[in-house]
């Protein structure tokens, strides 16, 4: 995807101030609702989707969701799951897709410092800190977590949801794994998917999405059954209702790119 110049982004931002939101005529787009109170999880999923905008309408939608995200981050920086949202916004800025205020990088640093939740969820944030600030300590911490994830992902005794997250991190960040073996990672993916269908596990949309992203990375290098991937996409689509915006975003992304 071609990166817009600063001038082009500036023109689009000025147009966004004077033009109304796009008409809601395309069923495959998730248009912003100014009356809705979006959660950090929902906005992060929407930014992940529209960061790959395909047309001008989707770019306008992206800008609207970024505005919502910035307001939420500024007003409620300590909400659960805020670290991921801040990371999505900061990464869009790093890629030159949007302009972001300078305080976002400080917000990212603060969020990573105070986040005491699941270390797996910090990996992308830590790697982004390394990219934008050349923070070698963040890179080392991320590498340690990624290698721990790789080991946990290959252990059948690891709790299923945690194993899915660990496999996703290990595969999508495999350059940081000391001895990454794509065949063994593929075996872990197939074992997980077989267990899900054999035992009728009810996975949350984000776990299904993580499995699909991992499969997309692995498929060109090791056997990943296409029927298993399609079953997961179908499950994800079933969760996508107007009341579950994050699931809708995940499902749309999977249909387009996975």
Model-identified regions with their sequence ranges:
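Solvent-exposed loop and edge beta-strand segments that line ligand/cofactor-binding
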Residues: 4, 29-43, 71-83, 110-120, ...
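Alpha-helical repeat scaffolds
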Residues: 62-66, 100-112, 141-146, 185-196, ...
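Helix-terminus loop motifs that line ligand-binding clefts
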Residues: 9, 24, 61-84
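Short coil/turn connectors between adjacent alpha-helices in alpha-solenoid helical repeat scaffolds
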Residues: 51-58, 93-101, 131-139, 177-184, ...
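Alpha-helical scaffold segments in carbohydrate-active enzymes
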Residues: 17-18, 68, 72, 91, ...
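Low-complexity, intrinsically disordered tandem-repeat tracts enriched in small residues
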Residues: 58, 69, 73, 89, ...
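Amphipathic alpha-helical elements of HEAT/ARM-like alpha-solenoid repeat scaffolds that form extended
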Residues: 40-50, 80-92, 119-130, 163-177, ...
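Low-complexity, Ser/Thr/Pro/Gly-enriched N-terminal "stalk/linker" regions
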Residues: 1-38, 45-51, 56-57, 63
């Amino acid at each position: 995807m071609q990166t817009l110049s600063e001038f082009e982004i500036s023109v689009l931002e000025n147009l966004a101030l004077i033009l109304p939101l796009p008409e809601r005529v395309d069923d495959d787009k998730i248009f912003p609702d100014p009356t809705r109170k979006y959660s950090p999880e929902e906005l992060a999923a929407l930014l992940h989707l529209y960061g790959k905008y395909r047309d001008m309408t989707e770019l306008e939608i992206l800008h609207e969701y970024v505005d919502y995200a910035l307001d939420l981050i500024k007003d409620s920086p300590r909400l659960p799951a805020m670290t991921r949202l801040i990371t999505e916004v900061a990464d869009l800025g790093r890629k030159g897709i949007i302009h972001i205020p300078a305080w976002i990088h400080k917000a990212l640093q603060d969020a990573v410092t105070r986040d005491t939740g699941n270390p797996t969820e910090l990996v992308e944030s830590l790697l982004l800190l390394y990219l934008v600030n050349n923070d070698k300590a963040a890179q080392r911490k991320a590498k340690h977590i990624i290698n721990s994830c790789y080991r946990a992902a290959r252990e059948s005794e690891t709790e299923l949801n945690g194993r899915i997250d660990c496999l996703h991190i290990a595969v999508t960040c495999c350059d940081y794994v000391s001895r990454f073996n794509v065949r063994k990672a593929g075996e872990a993916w197939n074992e997980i998917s077989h267990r899900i269908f054999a035992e009728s596990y009810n996975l949350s949309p984000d776990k299904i999405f993580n499995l699909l992203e991992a499969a997309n990375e692995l498929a060109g290098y090791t056997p990943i059954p296409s029927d298993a991937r399609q079953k997961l996409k179908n499950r994800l689509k079933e969760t996508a209702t107007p009341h579950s915006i994050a699931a809708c975003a995940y499902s749309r992304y999977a249909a387009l790119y996975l």
